[in-house]
Amino acid sequence: MADSSFDIVSKIDRQEVDNALNQAAKELATRFDFRGTDTTIAWKGDEAIELVSSTEERLKAAVDVFKEKLVRRDISMKAFDAGDPQPSGKTYRLTGTLKQGIDTENAKKINKIIRDEGPKGVKSQVQGDEIRVSSKKRDDLQAIIALLKGSDLDIALQFVNYR
């Protein structure tokens, strides 16, 4: 019998993020406590989101609104890295980035967790920005998925191509 395997990836659905951004922009435009603060939210490039407001408190509230919309669209908070508010003239600016892909540092952490705490006979290998995990038994693969979901990593993980 051939080995069973799955891939560990860290990807976000850009369309869902765009929907969350549009919902947040609509709420910021219509909510009473944001009137007169010139609070805006928009894309800045491909992987960054920029929020602008007249006060730092309204800027933090706008970030909370955006995070709430992300959660409702089933996007992990680990995928959005909000920067620090920067004063810019009469306004405050915040640029948040979206994190995708598994970098080498996190790949090493995941491989170490699988090696140290996972069942014996499970092999993992890094393939670009994803990790392929394989084993003879499917139960071992399910144990690895449960182990990684319970671990405290600073990236959002998805498990795909379960064969």
Curated annotation (Swiss-Prot):
Keyword match Nucleotide-binding: yes
Molecular functions (GO terms): nucleotide binding
Cellular component, GO annotation: cytosol
InterPro entries according to UniProt: DUF520, UPF0234-like_C, UPF0234_N, YajQ-like_sf
Cysteine disulfide partners in this protein: none
Entry keyword annotation includes Cell membrane: no
Pfam family, one: DUF520
Keywords associated with the record: Nucleotide-binding
Family: Belongs to the YajQ family.
Function: Nucleotide-binding protein.
NCBIfam families: PRK05412.1
Name of the protein: Nucleotide-binding protein MAB_3912
Protein's organism: Mycobacteroides abscessus (strain ATCC 19977 / DSM 44196 / CCUG 20993 / CIP 104536 / JCM 13569 / NCTC 13031 / TMC 1543 / L948)
